[in-house]
């Protein structure tokens, strides 16, 4: 299936949807707009970001913030506090362990259960 | 780093290069042109394909062959014999377990060790 068809089913910002299962990881797509994702980390889990469309502001502790654009690929390593936001709508692909909570241990109004992400 | 920069370093067809490590998986890019990849399977490992540019002919046992185009995402499940080829140069992203041999247990002239893929 094309990534655009998967994205067309995403109706909420910050709400990742699983598009594939590859061994112990889920591949997901999400749409980001705004600053609603809280600072968080994934204690034992790396998380990969790939920009499909638009621009994503990436903030990571101990680093200068940087802007990711279409085609950029970045892995935030386990345990590192980070936050992503976007002024305009941005489409991303995520590669995460199945066990990864997308906002880490931080519960916020954008937090979605894995069941919701699998719908 | 942008996927185009990673791809610009790929000088051989069928020779995947690791662009990121996410927990137990490697994310790779590769360029495909021709029919040199042998039929193979990955006994215990799923393998994800994402088309970055061009068209990829996907053949999988028990299915009609199909053509993947830019933005298409597909996971071939563990143990299923498959083969990919491309008439014109095609750029792909792969998501594979670190332990996955890219041509399965089949050794061919395109087979590359993980050390070569990490260079």
Which residues make up each language-model segment?
Chain A
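A short, N-terminal "cap"/entry segment at the start of jelly-roll beta-barrel domains
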Residues: 1-29, 107-119
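Conserved short histidine dyad/triad with adjacent acidic residue
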Residues: 26-42
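Glycine- and acidic-residue-biased ligand/ion/polar-headgroup-sensing regions
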Residues: 25, 44-57, 61-62
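Short glycine/proline-enriched turns and hinge-like loops at secondary-structure junctions
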Residues: 41-44, 86-88
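A cytosolic small-molecule/anion-sensing beta-strand core signal
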Residues: 23, 52-53, 69-70, 88
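Ligand-binding loop in jelly-roll beta-barrel domains
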Residues: 78-106
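Short acidic-glycine-tyrosine-enriched beta hairpin
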Residues: 62-79
């Amino acid at each position: 299936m094309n990534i655009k068809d998967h994205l067309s089913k995403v109706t909420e910002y910050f709400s990742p949807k699983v598009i594939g299962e590859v061994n112990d990881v889920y591949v997901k797509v999400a749409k980001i707009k705004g600053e609603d994702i809280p600072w968080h980390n994934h204690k034992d889990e790396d998380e990969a970001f790939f920009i499909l469309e638009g621009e994503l502001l990436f903030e990571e502790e101990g680093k200068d913030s940087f802007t990711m654009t279409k085609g950029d690929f970045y892995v935030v390593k386990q345990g590192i506090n980070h936050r992503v936001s976007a002024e305009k709508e941005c489409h991303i692909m995520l590669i995460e362990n199945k066990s990864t909570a997308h906002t880490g241990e931080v519960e916020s109004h954008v937090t979605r259960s894995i069941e919701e992400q699998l719908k």
